[in-house]
Curated annotation (Swiss-Prot):
The gene is RPS4. Coiled coil: none annotated. This is Small ribosomal subunit protein eS4. It is found in: Cytoplasm. It comes from Solanum tuberosum (Potato). Belongs to the eukaryotic ribosomal protein eS4 family. PANTHER family: 30S/40S RIBOSOMAL PROTEIN S4, SMALL RIBOSOMAL SUBUNIT PROTEIN ES4.
């Protein structure tokens, strides 16, 4: 007989991109219900303890959060397992630090440091545009937001620029060929490039062909793509590497060059 949601998560079953030690204990933090899927998020306890190293233990994280020191998207969060996800802005006012959660080219979450002006907004992918009671239009975003009376030109798969203080749409990007995107799912997760071609398949998934700034081409599904900006210029700063995935040979050459450059 089922008794509701599981309240625990074994460490071996935790997502690989959390990068937890296999021998660090039997259990991992089970993400709370929230705006992101449990396998596509990073709980606050892992951000504070494992990534930023502001705490050594689980209990230290709880005491930091209970002092209301950590904000996600401009709101104080005290839940230790709150699921922060892609594009979320994590702020610590006491240290004047702001981070945006992005993917690296290996598909792992990366805390990318931000300037103050960039921490005031986030980009949100539009999941659907619908009409509610009395014909009021509203849109749903990838992080569970519902925004009423959007611009009539905004459609599904477009990206909106959201002001985190007022929760209002400042601008939007159409999902078009020629715009820069980041892949948020599949084997190419974390790669950044420009949409070159869009293939429609009746009764199946739409395929996008993307080319990065180095000329590498790859394909992915439509649902795995998040538009970052108009043309080739993204609206948010990107982590080191700019979302370009090197081949094994290119990576080896880069490491050899770095080793030879460092004095013995």
């Amino acid at each position: 007989m089922a008794r509701g949601l599981k309240k625990h998560l074994k460490r071996l079953n935790a997502p690989k991109h959390w990068m937890l030690d296999k021998l660090g204990g039997a259990f991992a933090p089970k993400p709370s219900s929230g705006p992101h899927k449990s396998r596509e998020c990073l709980p606050l306890v892992i951000i504070m303890r494992n990534r930023l190293k502001y705490a050594l233990t689980y209990r230290e994280v709880i005491s930091i959060l209970m002092q209301r020191q950590v904000m996600v998207d401009g709101k104080v969060r005290t839940d230790k397992t709150y699921p922060a996800g892609f594009m979320d802005v994590v702020s610590i006012p006491k240290t004047n630090e702001n981070f945006r959660l992005l993917y690296d080219t290996k598909g792992r979450f990366r805390l990318h440091s931000l300037r103050d002006e960039e921490s005031k907004f986030k980009l949100c992918k539009v999941r659907s545009v619908q009409f509610g009671q009395k014909g009021i239009p509203y849109l749903n975003t990838y992080d569970g937001r519902t925004i009423r009376y959007p611009d009539p030109l905004i459609k599904a798969n477009d990206t909106i620029k959201l002001d985190l203080e007022s929760n209002k749409i400042v601008d939007f990007i159409k999902f078009d060929v020629g715009n820069v995107v980041m892949v948020t799912g599949g084997r190419n997760r974390g790669r950044v490039g420009v949409i070159k071609n869009r293939e429609k398949h009746k009764g199946s998934f739409e395929t996008l062909h993307i080319q990065d700034s180095q000329g590498h081409e790859f394909a992915t599904r439509l649902g795995n793509v998040f538009t970052l900006g108009k043309g080739t210029k993204p609206w948010v700063s990107l982590p080191k590497g700019k979302g370009i995935k090197l081949t094994i040979i290119e990576d080896a050459r880069k490491r050899l060059a770095a080793q030879s450059a460092t004095p013995a």
